[in-house]
Amino acid sequence: SETLTVMPRVINTANNYIAIGENIHATRALRRDGKRVETLADGTEGVPFKDIQGESHLLNVPEHFKKTQPYEQGQIKHFMVAIWKGVHGNADDQEQGAKYVVQEAHRQEKAGARFLDLNVDEVSYDLAEQKRAMQWLVKTVQKVATVPLSIDSSNSEIIAEGLAAYDNVAGPPLLNSVALERVDALDLVERYNSHVMLTAASADGMPEDAEERLENVGRLIEETMKRGIEPDRVYIDPLAFPISVSKEYG
């Protein structure tokens, strides 16, 4: 019978821990009145940043973004802005969007990320637009990445688009993620020889307790073994929560 390689019960060195950088998401937001957002004398609003060469820039907020609900509620979804510029902007916008994304990828690598997670789900409600955004993001980040990419989405079609665009130069990608509600996503793991994140979610929602988590993950591990997916390509997200959420997590 096949045995699984597992992480130690006690993580006491950096070598026992695998960090996935999850900042390059269209969901990420900054407060408009926060210290990272700047308004120039001419009224231009944006996020100051330095590219990987150390040159200063301002990721300015396009006018149409100012009509969105997050902006009106005091937030700037800065990676959404960068991705929009990269996909739809003029030449200057495209360069600015790419530099913003690249500097964040570089920053996360320096901090020890072993995978760079990319998610574009909130870019649009339109699937074709989401796929286009994922293609652009993967191709932009992989030009500079020295660690593999993690392709993250709630939609398997978007994940497939990202995996297809990835060149594998930095190593096999990570599919983030597979749960009981979409076991068929493991087909993509086989097709692209990727790593995979298995989550402890139930087929119809969040698990109630540790026993249900173990049961859910066990069923998923069985599916990976049926497909011949090597244990060292499999990672587990137990969906752990702080005790402040519920006493069940204590």
Residue ranges and their predicted role:
Residues S1-P238, I243-G250:
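Domain-level signal for soluble alpha/beta catalytic cores
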